[in-house]
From Swiss-Prot:
Location(s) in or outside the cell: Nucleus
Gene3D superfamilies linked: Classic Zinc Finger (3.30.160.60)
UniProt keyword annotations, A-Z: DNA-binding, Metal-binding, Nucleus, Repeat, Transcription, Transcription regulation, Zinc, Zinc-finger
Chain intervals with Basic residues compositional bias: 545-557
Region feature (Disordered): 60-232, 543-575
Protein name: Zinc finger protein 652-B
A Pfam family recorded for this sequence: zf-C2H2
Gene Ontology terms, MF aspect: DNA-binding transcription factor activity, RNA polymerase II-specific; RNA polymerase II cis-regulatory region sequence-specific DNA binding; zinc ion binding
Zinc finger (C2H2-type): 235-258, 262-284, 289-312, 319-341, 347-369, 375-397, 403-425, 431-453, 459-482
Gene: znf652-b
Pro residues bias locations: 561-571
Biased composition (Acidic residues): 80-108, 148-167
Origin organism lineage: Eukaryota, Metazoa, Chordata, Craniata, Vertebrata
Length: 602
């Protein structure tokens, strides 16, 4: 041990020193404004070659990416600043050693991370960012520093800088300021590149290009165009199915096509395309389908077919009046119609003095005075005063009415009524009220409406004398007026005998109907007025029905029947009192007598 001690003592002091002296670099590190980012001054000790090799490996040999280099530099600065603060505070040397060892461990961790290669041009602007394989750059010759750029020609630098300023007005600040030694620029790099080696998001967009050589585009897009193209690759129009690559074409399409809407001049409706407007004019807006007969226009073809079938199916009126445009079947009818527009009335009736415009009107009027019936039915030899009456009568023999509506199936005896009915389907209302302006399909309907303004009531009640404006109102009144209740408990036959003084004579055989004994019926039935036309049995009315019986001079003899004759057709309103069934009292009383006699025989 004694021999070994002198050997140990003979070791030069230059190869043996404490760890604190080797790693305490707070006072030996400084910044300078030259091409190299850092420079370190150290004593001639063993740690000096090691530190130089580390610096060369970080910055030149392994060509670490700039973001990792900045991370290491930032960590060293932070560690250096922390060491300076510890020296100023007079901390222990052991604490300094621990901090330095932690900083070296962090450097080793950062060094082992994946390499990222940043390519710059002569003007220190970033061209490409790529990743290396296993920490080795793909093409180290592509990395350029500011010291290499300084050897270039000044003319090329000016030209490149001018072009690059136009193409890339907003360069990446963290990657451009990497080559400068200003303290402000270094602080900006440390802010943009974190301690963990992350890079900004703008640089990661170009990582897919790899380590290929930079290719300068002839006419690069401006940042606004790039942003628009990246925002939507395919832009679809909202109003039509067209698709565009750029927003500029889409806006141009919107201005030309959709914002200049096609407006219909007739109805004001707007359309996107001109073809839609033309289709609208042909179908919906313009009535371009015209009837040849009456010149009426329609929108649809089927409407024209229905119009021809309904209106012009039976005949075609090709001739029209020049004054009122009324149409007729022949020109002769037109000439006869023109007389209606003149004020002259040369044809006068000799009997009553009434004047007419046409001779035919005078002939028709003269039939009222003479009673002549020139129109005869060939089937039953019945004669009529007017031709329309004969036409209406012919429907009895035919089995159906002559004029039938093809639209609804309703039939009519007279053509006048048929024409008025057809107007309900076509929508024509030529008759207008002079007071309120309401239009109607027929003149009788207009006259009935006009009574609401004038207050005219032409329909009186025969029983009570009350007057009504319309015939249906009178009919409803008659049903109510004849339904007057009689006293309860009185037999209907007895009620009739009490109220009728003409039947109170017992000699007639009807006054005491419940107690009277009528002899057996004679060979000639007393109640049959005519053997060819017997009266059908009538049902007995309600016991509470009251019959308005008026005294009259007609007496019916049961033994002698009246002379056979054809009864005339019943009038609309008889002068005699009617019961609730619209029958006279005589026929009803005869029916009661027949029923009573039949009950007594049984």
């Amino acid at each position: 041990m004694v021999v070994d001690d002198p050997c140990l003592l003979n070791i030069p002091t230059s190869f043996y020193h404490s760890t604190n002296q080797e790693l305490d670099l707070s006072n030996k590190t400084f910044k300078r404004e030259v091409g190299g980012p850092y420079s370190v001054m150290m004593d001639n000790k063993i740690g000096k070659p090691h530190l130089l090799e580390t610096d060369q490996q970080n910055f030149f040999q392994d060509s670490k990416p700039t973001n990792e280099v900045h991370a290491v530099k930032g960590e060293r600065e932070n560690s250096g600043e922390s060491e300076e603060e510890e020296d100023e505070d007079d901390d222990d040397d052991d604490d300094d050693d621990d901090d330095d060892e932690e900083g070296e461990d962090e450097d080793e961790v950062n060094y082992k991370r994946e390499q990222i290669i940043v390519e710059v041009n002569l003007n220190n602007q970033t061209l490409n960012v790529s990743k290396g394989d296993k920490g080795v750059p793909k093409d180290p010759s592509q990395i350029k520093t500011s010291s290499d750029d300084e050897g270039g020609d000044s003319g090329e630098d000016d030209q490149d800088s001018h072009e690059d300023e136009e193409n890339n007005p907003l360069p990446l600040d963290g990657q451009t300021n990497m080559q400068h030694g200003n303290q402000d620029q270094k602080t900006e790099n440390s802010d943009m590149v974190g301690g963990d080696g992350t890079i900004p998001a703008n640089s990661t967009k170009e990582q897919g290009k790899g380590g290929e050589a930079p290719k300068r585009k002839k006419k690069p897009k401006s940042p606004s165009d790039k942003a628009k193209s990246e925002e939507k690759e395919t832009l679809t129009c909202d109003k039509c199915p067209r698709v565009f690559n750029t927003r500029w074409y889409l806006e141009k399409h919107m201005n030309v096509t959709h914002r200049r809407m096609q407006i219909c001049d007739k109805c004001g409706k707007k359309f996107v395309l001109e073809s839609e407007l033309s289709l609208h004019l042909q179908t919906d807006c313009e009535k371009n389908i015209q009837c040849i007969t009456c010149n009426k226009t329609f929108k649809k073809l089927w409407s024209l077919h229905e119009h021809i079938k309904i209106v012009h199916g039976y005949a075609e009126k090709k001739f029209s009046c020049e004054i009122c445009e009324k149409k007729f079947y022949t020109m002769a009818h037109v000439r006869k119609h023109l007389v209606a527009h003149t004020k002259d009335m040369p044809f006068t009736c000799e009997t009553c003095g009434k004047s007419f415009k046409r001779s035919m009107s005078l002939k028709v009027h003269s039939l009222q005075h003479s009673g002549e019936k020139p129109f005869r039915c060939e089937n039953c030899d019945e004669r009529f005063q007017y031709k329309y009456q004969l036409r209406s009568h012919m429907s009895i023999h035919i089995g159906h009415k002559q004029f039938m509506c093809q639209w609804c199936g309703k039939d009519f005896n007279m053509k006048q009524y048929f024409d008025e009915h057809m107007k309900t389907h076509t929508g024509e209302k030529p008759f207008i009220c002079e007071i309120c302006g309401k239009s109607f399909t027929s003149r009788p309907n207009m006259k009935r409406h006009r009574r609401t303004h004038t207050g005219e009531k032409p329909y009186p009640c025969d029983v009570c004398g009350m007057r009504f404006r319309f015939s249906n109102m009178l009919k409803a009144h008659k049903e109510k007026c004849f339904r007057v209740t009689s006293p309860v408990g009185v037999p209907p036959a007895l009620q009739i005998t009490l109220n009728n003084p003409t039947l109170s004579n017992p000699s007639q055989g009807i006054s005491n109907l419940p107690n009277a004994h009528i002899p057996p019926p004679s060979p000639t039935p007393p109640l049959n007025l005519n053997a060819l036309n017997p009266l059908p049995p009538r049902p007995i009315p309600h016991p509470f029905s009251h019959l308005h019986l008026h005294p009259h001079s007609h007496t019916h003899h049961l033994a002698v029947p009246p002379v056979p004759h054809l009864p005339p057709p019943p009038a609309l309103f008889k002068s005699e009192a009617l019961n609730h069934r619209g029958q006279n009292d005589d026929s009803f009383l005869r029916h009661l007598a027949e029923k009573t006699s039949a009950g007594q025989h049984h």
